[in-house]
């Protein structure tokens, strides 16, 4: 299967074999967030569009990397399970190619990791990366190490840095795409009820309105994607505790997201993960977990982002949830997640459209 995917990637790239513009950065292993106020780079005029699908990574290796276990260590990191899903799915779909076969055509893959293990060249482990060198959008990361054992230790230690770096880049790529192809109906209804702006998935075609609540859905039997937005008064910092979130979410969903029979409604399962983050330079509570329908065999993953609308002293919650029992859910929920970060609160409506929506992981330059 991976050979087929690689062959498709090569065919797609061959039609776009042009030389891109460089945007080089040196890096060490310490991560930091790039400010949301900085403008996102636009596609250079003569740079081709990158090939490959979202969350696909091409790893370029030397033959010895297979023998020492260095490649396997990196592969295991990249394919670690996505958090918050109802079934095991890899963080990334990994293809591999030896350096001898890393042709110009393959230079246009959207995410590339090059393994550089050589004691004659490197004295310590380090990340290096470049953006949009051969195509757009694209990240080419070099992982340097003096030997295989140091490489393996470095990659394991920086597991979260690697995953978050590429994941956030993909989320921002999707957010940029949504700003060009968004759902005008959702945007209008959200503005009318909440005074907020958002770029949501074009496929959302069904709507339900409640009190301080909107629900948009693709209304599919499978691969069903849903977006909800609701608000409630902001009290104090205790508003962002786990217990408060679950109680508030369950009360809102009970009133607005029913099951097929009376007495059935959406609930939050105990499997919930909380993360404090920043969106547009302000605090955001990001929650991932699973939902189900009370007394009914139906459920799936959700992700929500809660932010404080200081102008109106309320909490605005945007959430995406998926129902797709017969298929993988990673790309579905991540498309929805990307749309959540495009939310503009009333005091943010003058933000430029080309700013970062979710702070990227940026590895410190030397």
Q: At which residue positions do the language-model features occur?
A:
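Bacterial N-terminal signal peptides that target proteins for export
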Residues: 1-8
């Amino acid at each position: 299967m991976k050979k087929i995917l690689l062959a498709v990637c090569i065919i797609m790239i061959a039609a776009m074999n042009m030389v891109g513009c460089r945007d080089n950065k040196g890096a060490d292993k310490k991560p930091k967030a790039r400010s949301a106020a900085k403008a996102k780079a636009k596609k250079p005029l003569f740079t081709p569009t990158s090939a490959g699908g979202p969350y696909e990574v091409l790893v370029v290796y030397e033959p010895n990397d297979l023998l020492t276990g260095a490649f396997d260590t990196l592969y295991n990191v990249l394919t670690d399970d996505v958090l918050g899903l109802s079934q095991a799915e890899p963080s990334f779909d990994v293809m591999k190619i030896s350096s001898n076969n890393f042709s110009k055509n393959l230079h246009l893959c959207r995410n590339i990791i090059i393994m550089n293990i050589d004691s004659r060249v490197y004295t310590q482990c380090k990340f290096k990366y470049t953006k949009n060198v051969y195509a757009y959008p694209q990240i080419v990361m070099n992982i340097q190490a003096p030997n295989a054992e140091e490489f393996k230790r470095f990659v394991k230690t920086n597991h979260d840095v690697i995953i978050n770096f590429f994941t956030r880049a993909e989320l921002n790529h999707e957010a940029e795409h949504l700003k060009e192809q968004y759902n005008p109906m959702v945007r209008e209804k959200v503005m009318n009820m909440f005074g907020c702006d958002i770029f949501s998935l074009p496929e959302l075609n069904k709507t339900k309105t409640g009190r301080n609540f909107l629900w948009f859905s693709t209304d599919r039997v499978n691969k069903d994607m849903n977006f909800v937005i609701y608000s409630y008064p902001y009290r104090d910092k205790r508003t962002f505790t786990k217990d408060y979130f679950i109680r508030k979410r369950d009360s809102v969903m009970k009133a607005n997201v029913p099951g097929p029979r009376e007495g059935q409604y959406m609930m939050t399962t105990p499997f919930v993960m909380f993360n404090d983050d920043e969106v547009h330079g302000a605090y955001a509570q990001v929650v991932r977990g699973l939902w189900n329908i009370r007394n009914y065999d139906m459920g799936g993953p959700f992700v929500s982002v809660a932010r404080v609308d200081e102008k109106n002293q309320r909490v605005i919650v945007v959430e995406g949830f998926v129902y797709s029992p017969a298929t993988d859910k990673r790309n579905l929920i991540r498309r929805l997640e990307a749309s959540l970060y495009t939310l503009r609160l009333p005091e943010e409506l003058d933000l430029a459209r080309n700013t970062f929506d979710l702070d990227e992981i940026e590895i410190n330059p030397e």
